[in-house]
């Protein structure tokens, strides 16, 4: 992470890198626009290493219109996969033709395929899966898509940089940041068990110290950053955020193993 912070400081060309600079885009993004048909083919090509059976069912999902694809009046934002034990899995997304939209389809199709295989191989009482593994299947697909696009010989430099930046951002946000959240949560509970006061000042100091430890000496940590813990809703559901980090790490290892 320290090397990433130093790299970000150099690319942005700033004398001081503040915490808010960690979220500034490093690239101009990808201007390419994809049709839904192109997106489907990109996903199918990306998941081909998972085998013929997997690819056949993904095609089935596209052909049978498991996906509510486009934004619409009154439609919720975001994306998710749902369904029940005796139905097909269904996906709600808001496809806009961006590379991020393509990645979202790959991600949500991973959830749906996880559900499909689980429901077709397990009785109802065992077919559900925990959060600990839920993000693995979806993120494997997402990573396979990135690797597939990076491997294209004629990929333009801007898109390649955007893909690499997305990979780095995923690691920062899902592995490092969620681990930092988990450590904050653990230490706050430990303070309570020792009988220490959990007042704002104590929690602010704990959070700010963790940011300094995780991001290193190249980052300027302004005083306002210490209050960030108070706006993070994950802490209302104790001791689960580490699962994002373990899930993403597992997905990266699996996708690399699949491609090798």
Report each predicted region and the residues it spans.
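Cation-handling catalytic/transport regions enriched in His/Asp/Glu
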Residues: 1-260
């Amino acid at each position: 992470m320290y090397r990433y912070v130093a790299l970000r400081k150099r690319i942005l060309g700033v004398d001081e890198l503040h915490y808010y600079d960690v979220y500034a885009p490093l690239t101009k993004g990808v201007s390419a626009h994809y049709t839904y048909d192109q997106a489907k083919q990109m996903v199918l090509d990306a998941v081909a290493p998972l085998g013929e059976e997997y690819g056949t069912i993904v095609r089935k999902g596209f052909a049978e219109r498991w996906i509510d694809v486009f934004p619409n009046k009154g439609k919720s934002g975001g994306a998710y996969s749902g369904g029940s034990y005796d139905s097909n899995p269904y996906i709600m997304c808001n496809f806009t033709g961006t590379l991020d939209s393509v990645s979202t389809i790959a991600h949500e199709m991973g959830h749906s395929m996880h559900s499909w295989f689980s429901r077709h191989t397990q009785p109802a009482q065992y077919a559900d899966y925990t959060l600990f593994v839920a993000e693995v299947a979806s993120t494997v697909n997402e990573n396979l898509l990135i690797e597939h696009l990076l491997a294209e010989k004629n990929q333009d430099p801007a898109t390649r940089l955007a893909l690499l930046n997305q990979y780095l951002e995923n690691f920062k946000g899902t592995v490092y940041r969620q681990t930092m959240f988990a450590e904050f949560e653990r230490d706050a509970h430990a303070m309570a068990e020792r009988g220490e006061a959990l007042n704002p000042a104590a929690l602010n100091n704990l959070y700010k110290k963790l940011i300094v430890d995780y991001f290193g000496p190249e980052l300027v940590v302004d005083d306002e950053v210490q209050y960030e813990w108070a706006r993070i809703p994950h802490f209302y559901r104790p001791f689960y955020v580490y699962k994002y980090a373990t899930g993403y790490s597992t997905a990266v290892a699996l996708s690399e193993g699949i491609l090798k």
